[in-house]
A protein has these predicted regions:
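Solvent-exposed interaction surfaces and binding hotspots enriched for charged
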Residues: 2-100
Length: 100
């Protein structure tokens, strides 16, 4: 993560992961993942809209917002996949708990 990450960043992320892990005990983890991605997209659309004054303003920054959120998600996913590749046995092996 970047130097701009505040000290509560990972705590907030862990709280969302805890909710997802709880939901994954009740329903397929793919469905939980899809719901989490939708919630993230919905919230980020609101974040983008809240920084504008009108529908036209939002439309004018749509491409920039998409580029930013897609780029950031890709970097975060790549970092996390690389971490899981490096520590696969530790994270996914017997006794690991194998949750997000």
């Amino acid at each position: 993560m970047t130097a701009e990450t505040d000290k509560e960043f990972f705590q907030r992320a862990d709280e969302y992961i805890d909710v997802a892990n709880q939901q994954a005990t009740q329903v397929n983890r793919g469905k939980v993942s899809a719901s989490m991605m939708f919630a993230t997209a919905r919230f980020n659309a609101w974040v983008s809209a809240s920084g504008t004054e009108s529908s036209e303003d939002l439309a004018s920054v749509k491409a920039e917002a998409l580029e930013y959120f897609i780029s950031e998600y890709r970097k975060m996913l790549e970092e996390n996949l690389d971490e899981y590749i490096e520590h696969f046995d530790k994270y996914m092996g017997p006794g690991s708990g194998a949750s997000g």
